[in-house]
Amino acid sequence: MKQLHPVMFVGTGSDVGKSVLAAAFCRIFRQDGYQPAPFKAQNMALNSYATPDGFEIGRAQAVQAEAAGIPCHTDMNPLLLKPQSDHTSQVILHGKPVGNKHAYDYWRRQGDKKTRRQDVTIDYRAEVCTAFDRLSAKYNPIVMEGAGSISEINLRDTDLVNLPMARHAKADVILVGDIDRGGVFASVYGSIALQSPEDRKLIRGIIINKFRGDMRLFDEGRRMLEELCGIPVLGVVPYFKDIHIEEEDSVALAQKSWQLMQGKINVAVVMLQHLSNYTDFDALERDPRVHLFYTNNVDDISKADIIILPGTKSTLSDLYELRRNGCAQAIIKAHREGASVLGICGGYQLMGMEVCDPHHFEGDIDRLPGLGLLPITTTMNGEKRTRQVKCDYGTGYEIHMGETIPFGDAPAKPLTILDDGRSDGYVVSDKCMGTYIHGILDNAAFVDKLLSPFADKIEHVGAAFDYQAFKEQQYDKLAAHVRKYVDIDKIYHILSD
């Protein structure tokens, strides 16, 4: 196939649709016979994923790699920032943690400058550029994604991910604007006007995203935008709700319906303050037997058939908050009255007798009593376990810190045995269990086990749900949607010019 330039999707702001458009083009290029790969130099997200070789990257790049039909790799997202508080993030470089950074130190004092880790000098800009170079030697084209807005001129000197990265990659840049939030003319024109003359030349096209209504009403707007900016509008993509791509940000979770439904098993996912890896529940949410909702309301929790405690980036902080807001007591009471409780990763730790952090890896709290639903104890340590796993129920992945063992003289009752012979999780009964395995709910065998105590509540049972096949269908639907409204031939011309 002909060698194409890298393409980079940048935005007028956050949540304009860069990640989804990048996934769409990963699938489009694959359908057209190319071997694309995604790349985002630096990502900030709690929703991460374990690569096949046991390292950690942002979930969006894992999704984009899946759309491209290739295994994910740390070179696709060499630098990941995982917020631990309002001001501090864990820095993941090439899939492994290298320490915590205060936001001011990272963005204002250091950013791309050299820092020291255990007497080793780290140059973040050099690291991400080298990762890109390795990736571009293997795949064609590279589908790059920027971060946030390209107009944050106060952070330009430390920017690793937007136009400075495009310059290194010699990428053709496409600016994405979100018309649904309003002000698209100002945001697109302003984003371009605030760039240096050198960087403005990199922007080869504009895509207007999330359009609602009659497309013909924007014909004049499209012409005016092209005249204002001197850059072609390559497409106007309508807003959609019928295509389901795993999301990286949890903005929409609280908007999902919480009302109980008759004829289905009602599953409450507890909305922790530091909830992470909420894509654990995407497959369960699509299961026709289930009505899944997110809540931290004690009344909602008390009415659920199944309560799931999800992963968290700050176990002790969320445990403290659960006790403060009454959710801990509501979960214990609901379980006593017949509800099932499942904990995943940090949620598994919460279900134990205690969580200890004697060396303060998470914060200032030394120890807190857990919910007492499982006879286990967890001690936080500095080692992060990151790997993909196989177990009796199927596949998944681990991303966690802390060691969990039976409490006192409690016997070991693992939920499953992993492919390397290690035991995972703890099970008291079919209505009380925990696991470290993210993605376990993607496996039909485990979902059947979880739902079995409430099978008599299901009024209509359809065909078995194949989540992997569903995801493939969604990538194809997304590609078809973008092909319909974006000038793909023009983009190929730009990338070949």
What residue ranges belong to the model's regions?
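Flexible phosphate-sensing "switch/lid" loops adjacent to ATP/NTP-binding sites
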Residues: 1-333, 340, 382, 391-497
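Catalytic nucleophile serine of serine hydrolases
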Residues: 345
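Short active-site segment of divalent metal-dependent hydrolases/proteases
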Residues: 348-349, 441
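A conserved active-site-flanking secondary-structure segment within enzyme catalytic domains
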Residues: 352-404
